[in-house]
Amino acid sequence: MFLAQEIIRKKRDGHTLSDEEIRFFINGIRDNTISEGQIAALAMTIFFHDMTMPERVSLTMAMRDSGTVLDWKNLNLNGPIVDKHSTGGVGDVTSLMLGPMVAACGGYVPMISGRGLGHTGGTLDKLEAIPGFDIFPDDNRFRDIIQDVGVAIIGQTNSLAPADKRFYATRDITATVDSIPLITGSILAKKLAEGLDALVMDVKVGSGAFMPTYELSEALAEAIVGVANGAGVRTTALLTDMNQVLASSAGNALEVREAVQFLTGEYRNPRLFDVTMALCIEMLISGQLAKDDAQARAKLQAVLDNGKAAEVFGRMVAAQKGPTDFVENYDKYLPAAMLSKAVYADTEGFVSAMDTRALGMAVVSMGGGRRQASDTIDYSVGFTDMVRLGDSVDGQRPLAVIHAKDEANWQEAAKAVKAAIILDDKAPASTPSIYRRITE
């Protein structure tokens, strides 16, 4: 039997906690026998004293085990259980293509996703732009969809990692969110509760990233890979660029539209293609569905070219109570904004920098995201035809097309877009879509 205050004291004094002590504390968070003050105190001691790798693994496993851990063995699936997690960005719609692409190649993707957070868009919010789409099927239905379709994208239920929910709520109001061991534990507790064989992390870098510097993004990626592998799940991470909007669009229905166009081949943004393909390749190799990069790429390109990936997406939408002909008739179903018109720069020049975070917040301000949990979302608003870094803009080439609910909404967004996009008289050096691959 342990005392919570003695565990806090031990960590406060810079000592290493045992697996048993960590499990006792996390179980107390779940059972409400540990107070909010005690959670806050331990979070602050971890913030200042960090955690060893064994402590990080113990924390993650204890939070994972605080609720249901999905077990797929009795389904006798003929492929690996794999998933991807992104730290979030603007125009980051990769999940909507990646899940169906990997499923079409023989993987099973039980993706448990989140809503928008701050300036970043949420996969669940995007999918809810599809009429009828059910993000909370019951457990049996979720398992049936995975078995039949190969991919389902759902929201987190109360049974998955419940200790994390309470721990995070306390961190959020005590300035202890940005601690790498605590971020790592929070992300992985939920992902590892999916019962995965393999995981790939997409850790963003740049002006629209969760972590403010390259070094911190790199440290987070290394921590997640180390802990997840320590927990027995094959995991790699990619550091990917978020110094510009990833897709050509930002906004819920607009990004769903671009995802369908990507899958059908109607339109594929080159940077979005690079990042999506690279993440899928990691999943196929880690899931032992391909022996190397070249084989994985060939398989993925084949399911795009033969329409199988688009078909899987359509089947997933139908299985989750969306329209059965969504892929064929997406424009019929997705909500459209009242006003769509281009915004132009006041001067000519090359796009040299972009405040991606500000562009994400502009979508939120238009009604495309939440400032508080009770807000309702306008799924139709946002941007399309976004410029890229290095593009030349003038009276012919707009910065973006703004989809707004009215003229005042459009004017406010236009001001934000102009302020967020920096022009220069010469083109900047090109930046990679992917900075680094981390395997250990």
Curated annotation (Swiss-Prot):
Gene Ontology annotations of biological process type: pyrimidine nucleobase metabolic process; thymidine metabolic process
Pathway(s) per entry: Pyrimidine metabolism; dTMP biosynthesis via salvage pathway; dTMP from thymine: step 1/2
This protein's GO CC annotations: cytosol
A GO molecular-function descriptor: 1,4-alpha-oligoglucan phosphorylase activity
Keyword entries, A-Z: Glycosyltransferase, Transferase
EC numbers on record: 2.4.2.4
UniProt cross-references to SMART domains, sorted A to Z: PYNP_C
Enzyme class: transferase
Catalytic function, reaction form: thymidine + phosphate = 2-deoxy-alpha-D-ribose 1-phosphate + thymine
Keyword Glycosyltransferase: yes
InterPro entries per the UniProt record, alphabetical: Glycosyl_Trfase_fam3, Glycosyl_Trfase_fam3_N_dom, Glycosyl_Trfase_fam3_N_dom_sf, Nuc_phospho_transferase, PYNP-like_C_sf, PYNP_C, Pyrmidine_PPas_bac/euk, Pyrmidine_PPase_CS
HAMAP family tied to this protein: Thymid_phosp (MF_01628)
Family assignment from sequence similarity: Belongs to the thymidine/pyrimidine-nucleoside phosphorylase family.
Binding partners and assembly: Homodimer.
Function: The enzymes which catalyze the reversible phosphorolysis of pyrimidine nucleosides are involved in the degradation of these compounds and in their utilization as carbon and energy sources, or in the rescue of pyrimidine bases for nucleotide synthesis.
NCBIfam families: PRK05820.1, T_phosphoryl, Y_phosphoryl
Name of the molecule in the record: Thymidine phosphorylase
Species in which this protein is naturally found: Salmonella arizonae (strain ATCC BAA-731 / CDC346-86 / RSK2980)
